[in-house]
């Protein structure tokens, strides 16, 4: 038998030279199939002389067709996931392996054992029939004993064998008796999964079929499926603890395996039978070269590097209808990520995933239809319910994963809000521009809220719900989430929100006018007080700032102060309020002073009517020489005109006769100097005025006497 040596490029630390079986003339053809919803998967290998046989299989099943090319060709491609190794059967009696053991048999291998209650049906690869009988108990946990493997092998021509495996014990790796085991190893992300069980060997028509039924060992490890699988060394042999010797002969020679204590035990917990144990009888057979390759329904992951040779077939990915539906859902979700509500719903959908953050499952009657984010295809069976049970060793791992998921959630929330705030900051106007619009009576035309040029800033009346949970996922989903946040979200006004108001000077203002905030808002410097503390308009300032005073006319039009001036500078509002308070205080003070002055003046007795009438009167001339330098009346502030009658008080102050008469009737003082108008003076003047009468009377008498 010819042998050749190769070195796998993908495994750096493994053996540098490995033996391989010769490749048949027609090459090897591998057909794998899977009937979804069941626990069994199958793979068949056979030498093929023509490539037309690759289409074998029953309609309605999903097949993955692989063609194993020769080793040197595969080694030239570093990116290929198919690393094929054909090791030859060694001449050594035994080859020890840590986890798996399998015996390679030739044309005449006869094995007789006590069979387990559940024995699957084996059929030809042309008909591709599947195992119909399976154990439905989902609670087989932490058992270290194994059901003896059932082997029934008939003589065939080409030395190919058929293997059936059905594993129910996830912890059977720790079997102390070294049972006959069949497993698969793959390295990815520091995870591993074990598949062990009974095997049925049958050699028919040069075909080898492997029916693998592997259950996940740990719930947290079941969700991660490797895209490349590692195949066991071809026909590795391992001694049990009490096995005597195993001899392997090549090219038609015989090898005998004698094992007195080769007892393999396994306990299967069924609903009807528990603790059933069987023993394998000794096996004597003539064996010829055989080639066994293994493909399992669930690709196992092993933590750490393995020194054994591995084969990683390039597998065409089978895309199920559920995955297509999920991808369509992602596309639809990506198209609607402008809405905050859509984003929140997407996070809620992601929260509905199972305990393992890698898997998103939709439950339906019977099985679980699951989509794996990394890798993108797999199927989880009913045994997924066992994932709720974990061992103490894996409990720490689960808690660590929970912490990592929590940390990832809070980190994602922080990134979300950071991006959300960034979008809000970018949407706000700079340099004092106001980012919301007035009601339509001010803005004129209704703005399109969906326009990218418009920005809205609202006072929320009710809080928005935070994203409840974000699953720890990788790949394109996170990219889609980041893109959706960076796009910016245009939110419309909802019920309970109060819009900020923005006044436009002209309803149909152009874009360049809208960019000048100084033209749109009243400035505090435009309002000034005159000498009498009256609010006046400085025309120069008003023209420079182009203030529209008509805005303040809307106060009485039902707009309300809060609505009409909500855009005005708060300092200006404070200034206006202070000015109003000051005006009110001035009015109050003046009224109080007037009341005090009236009281003082009332204290002085008014002048008598006789004294008032006795005041001297002077006719005002054109040159005002009669009244001196006085130009106007101090009481009425009116200028003296020609022919006005002026009255002079004893203090030599001139007044209009009507004005001073009214004043003296209220207070007997001078309105200018507050000097009392003395009644004595009035009496004296009256007496002086009355003295000429007696003088006149004698004169009159003398006149009368003269005739």
Swiss-Prot record:
Stretch list, region Disordered: 1-32, 72-120, 250-314, 379-405, 424-493, 685-707
List all Basic and acidic residues biased stretches: 1-10, 257-276, 381-390
- Post-translational modification N-acetylserine, affected residues: 2
For this UniProt entry, the molecular function terms from Gene Ontology, in alphabetical order, are: protein kinase A catalytic subunit binding; protein kinase A regulatory subunit binding; ubiquitin protein ligase activity; zinc ion binding
Compositional bias ranges of the Acidic residues kind: 465-481
Q: Does the keyword Endoplasmic reticulum apply?
A: yes
Listed GO CC annotations: centriolar satellite; cytoplasm; endoplasmic reticulum membrane; glutamatergic synapse; Golgi membrane; plasma membrane; postsynaptic density
Chain positions of all zinc fingers (RING-type): 633-674
> What positions are modified (Phosphoserine)?
306, 320, 339, 430
Region Interaction with PRKAR1A, PRKAR2A and PRKAR2B: list its residue ranges: 530-707
- BP GO terms, sorted: inflammatory response; innate immune response; long-term memory; positive regulation of JNK cascade; positive regulation of p38MAPK cascade; positive regulation of toll-like receptor 2 signaling pathway; proteasome-mediated ubiquitin-dependent protein catabolic process; protein ubiquitination
Q: Where is the composition biased (Low complexity)?
A: 685-701
Region Mediates interaction with TBC1D31, annotated ranges: 549-569
**What is this protein for, i.e. what is its function?**
Has E2-dependent E3 ubiquitin-protein ligase activity. Responsible for ubiquitination of cAMP-dependent protein kinase type I and type II-alpha/beta regulatory subunits and for targeting them for proteasomal degradation. Essential for PKA-mediated long-term memory processes. Through the ubiquitination of MFHAS1, positively regulates the TLR2 signaling pathway that leads to the activation of the downstream p38 and JNK MAP kinases and promotes the polarization of macrophages toward the pro-inflammatory M1 phenotype. Plays a role in ciliogenesis by ubiquitinating OFD1.
The protein's annotated pathway: Protein modification; protein ubiquitination
The principal localisation class reads: cytoplasm
The annotated topology with respect to the bilayer is: Peripheral membrane protein
Do you know which Gene3D superfamilies this protein is assigned to?
Zinc/RING finger domain, C3HC4 (zinc finger)
**Phosphothreonine: residues carrying this PTM:** 385
Keywords attached to this Swiss-Prot or TrEMBL record, sorted alphabetically, are:
Acetylation, Cell membrane, Cytoplasm, Cytoskeleton, Endoplasmic reticulum, Golgi apparatus, Membrane, Metal-binding, Phosphoprotein, Synapse, Transferase, Ubl conjugation pathway, Zinc, Zinc-finger
Write the protein's name: E3 ubiquitin-protein ligase Praja-2
Q: Where does it localize?
A: Cytoplasm; Cell membrane; Endoplasmic reticulum membrane; Golgi apparatus membrane
- Domain of life, per UniProt, equals Eukaryota
The protein's enzyme class: transferase
Gene encoding this polypeptide? Pja2
């Amino acid at each position: 038998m010819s042998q050749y040596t190769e070195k796998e490029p993908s495994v750096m630390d493994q053996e540098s030279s490995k033996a391989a079986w010769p490749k048949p003339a027609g090459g090897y053809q591998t057909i794998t199939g899977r009937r979804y919803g069941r626990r069994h998967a199958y793979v068949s290998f056979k030498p093929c002389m023509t490539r037309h046989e690759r289409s074998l299989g029953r309609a309605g099943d999903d097949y993955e067709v692989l063609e194993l090319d020769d080793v040197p060709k595969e080694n030239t491609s570093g990116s290929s996931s198919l690393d094929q190794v054909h090791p030859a059967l060694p001449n050594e009696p035994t080859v020890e392996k840590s986890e798996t053991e399998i015996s390679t048999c030739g044309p005449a291998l006869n094995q007789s054992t006590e069979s387990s209650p559940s024995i699957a049906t084996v059929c030809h690869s042309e008909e591709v029939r599947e195992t119909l009988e399976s154990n439905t108990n989902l609670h087989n946990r932490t058992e270290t004993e194994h059901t003896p493997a059932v082997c029934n092998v008939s003589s065939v021509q080409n030395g190919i064998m058929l293997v059936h495996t059905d594993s129910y014990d996830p912890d059977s790796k720790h079997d102390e008796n070294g049972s006959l085991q069949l497993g698969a190893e793959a390295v990815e992300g520091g995870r591993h999964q074990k598949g062990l069980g009974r095997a049925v060997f049958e050699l028919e028509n040069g075909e080898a079929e492997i029916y693998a039924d592997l259950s996940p060992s740990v719930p947290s490890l079941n969700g991660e499926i490797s895209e490349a699988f590692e195949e066991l060394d071809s026909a590795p042999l391992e001694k049990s603890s009490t096995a005597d010797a195993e001899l392997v002969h090549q090219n038609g020679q015989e090898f005998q395996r004698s094992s007195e204590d080769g007892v393999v035990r396994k306990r299967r917990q069924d609903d009807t039978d528990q603790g059933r144990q069987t023993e394998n009888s000794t096996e004597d057979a003539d064996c010829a070269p055989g080639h066994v390759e293994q493909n399992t329904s669930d690709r196992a992951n092993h933590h750490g590097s393995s020194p054994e040779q591995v084969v990683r077939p390039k597998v065409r990915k089978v895309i199920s209808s559920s995955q297509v539906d999920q991808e369509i859902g992602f596309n639809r979700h990506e198209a609607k990520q402008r809405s905050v509500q859509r984003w929140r719903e997407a996070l809620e959908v992601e929260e509905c995933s199972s305990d393992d953050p890698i898997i998103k499952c939709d439950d339906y009657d019977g099985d679980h239809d699951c989509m794996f984010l990394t890798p993108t295809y797999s199927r989880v069976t009913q045994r997924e319910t066992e994932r709720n049970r974990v061992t103490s060793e894996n409990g720490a791992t689960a808690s660590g994963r929970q912490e990592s998921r929590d940390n990832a959630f809070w980190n994602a929330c922080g990134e979300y809000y950071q991006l959300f705030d960034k979008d809000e900051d970018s949407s706000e106007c700079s340099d004092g521009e106001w980012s919301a619009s007035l009601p339509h009576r001010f803005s004129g035309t209704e703005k399109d809220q969906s326009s990218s040029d418009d920005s809205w800033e609202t006072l929320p009346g009710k809080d928005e719900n935070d994203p409840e949970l974000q699953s720890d996922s990788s790949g394109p989903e996170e990219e889609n989430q980041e893109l959706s946040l960076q796009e910016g979200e245009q939110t419309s006004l909802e019920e309970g929100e109060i819009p900020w108001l923005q006044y436009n000077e002209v309803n149909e203002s152009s874009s360049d006018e809208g960019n000048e905030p100084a033209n749109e808002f009243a400035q505090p410097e435009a309002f000034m007080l005159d000498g009498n503390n009256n609010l006046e308009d400085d025309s120069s300032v008003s023209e420079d700032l182009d203030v529209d005073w008509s805005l303040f006319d809307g106060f009485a039009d039902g707009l309300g102060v809060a609505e009409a001036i909500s855009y005005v500078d708060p300092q200006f509002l404070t200034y206006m309020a202070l000015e109003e308070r000051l005006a009110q205080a001035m009015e109050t003070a003046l009224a109080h002073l007037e009341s005090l002055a009236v009281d003082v003046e009332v204290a002085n007795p008014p002048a008598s009517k006789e004294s008032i009438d006795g005041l001297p009167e002077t006719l005002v001339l054109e040159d005002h020489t009669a009244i001196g330098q006085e130009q106007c009346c101090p009481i009425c502030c009116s200028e003296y005109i020609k022919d006005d009658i002026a009255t002079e008080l004893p203090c030599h102050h001139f007044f209009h006769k009507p004005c001073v008469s009214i004043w003296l009737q209220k207070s007997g003082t001078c309105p200018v100097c507050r000097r009392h108008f003395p009644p004595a003076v009035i009496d004296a003047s009256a007496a002086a005025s009355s003295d000429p009468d007696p003088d006149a009377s004698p004169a009159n008498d003398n006149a009368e006497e003269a005739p």
